């Protein structure tokens, strides 16, 4: 898969284009084909114009990048490697809000194919990926981890 990514025969997707996801997507896009996915259409439109909504990156960060910004879930079907970089805010009691990673898991479950890879970059507590995210992905995709996706 690594060589196919470098040869641009396969595509990587980054889910969540905030202050963590966008720089990751842009850095990968300097070498491989990338889909940058965010649920916020206004943010996606800004990034298509080379503007970082968080104002952390300048327009030069978008130059010479092979990236397609989208909020269309169907575009994600072109990817074979997914990186989840959605926020995981905590409340006043330091309890994490898992809704963003759960929704990202639902999104991936709708497009995941046999042999695809999923990486969670989002900061979550130990066991969260296995206990909360993987079951959602498996239920929606109909695939089983390690047998049909990793």
Mark where each language-model region is.
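Conserved N-terminal Rossmann-fold NAD(P) cofactor-binding segment
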Residues: 2-11, 33-35, 39-81, 87-95, ...
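N-terminal Rossmann-fold NAD(P) dinucleotide-binding loop
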Residues: 21-22
């Amino acid at each position: 898969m690594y060589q196919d990514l470098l040869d641009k025969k396969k595509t990587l997707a980054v889910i969540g284009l905030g202050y963590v996801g966008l720089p990751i997507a842009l850095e990968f896009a300097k070498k491989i084909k990338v889909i940058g996915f965010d649920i916020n259409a206004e943010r996606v439109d800004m990034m298509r114009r080379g503007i970082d909504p968080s104002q952390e990156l300048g327009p030069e960060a978008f130059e010479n990048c092979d990236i397609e910004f989208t909020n269309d879930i169907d575009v994600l079907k072109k990817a074979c490697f997914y990186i989840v970089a959605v926020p995981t805010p905590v409340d006043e009691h330091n309890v994490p809000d898992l809704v963003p990673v759960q929704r990202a898991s639902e999104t991936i479950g709708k497009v995941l194919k046999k042999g695809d890879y999923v990486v969670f970059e989002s900061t979550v507590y130990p066991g969260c990926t296995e206990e909360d995210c993987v079951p959602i992905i498996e239920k929606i995709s109909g695939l089983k981890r390690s047998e049909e996706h990793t």
